[in-house]
């Protein structure tokens, strides 16, 4: 029926333990820089990857989850990189064992209605990253077995957004 088709399309695809494979790479640190705007938000990320020591085979691609993102730029160790865009993410082709990935994307939280990733509600920016919402913010290894230390910077027009509240400890505040 039409209703069951809609419901099945909204349901996430199940992931079974028997299909689990460890990630070829892990993440040491993640730095996020949000430039919040009325019509768009630019998210810049700097992610430090390293080879997972339990994975011994060589890797010719690394899949990063990403949905509803407009890719502006992508670099590995400051250089252009080969990649392949897909609807649900991108493949980095021939990634080094250890590298720094820099990605810049454009997102539109002002027009999101699914309440995942970064979205606006009553004029406030909000995030919902569990279970798979983070992939709507930037390209990332969005899986529960890959952990990282995060540093986040939020930039916004003070007149439009006088209060910026983030989960974590305040490191620095400026009035620019």
What are these regions (language model features)?
Residues 2-176:
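Acidic/His-enriched low-complexity segments
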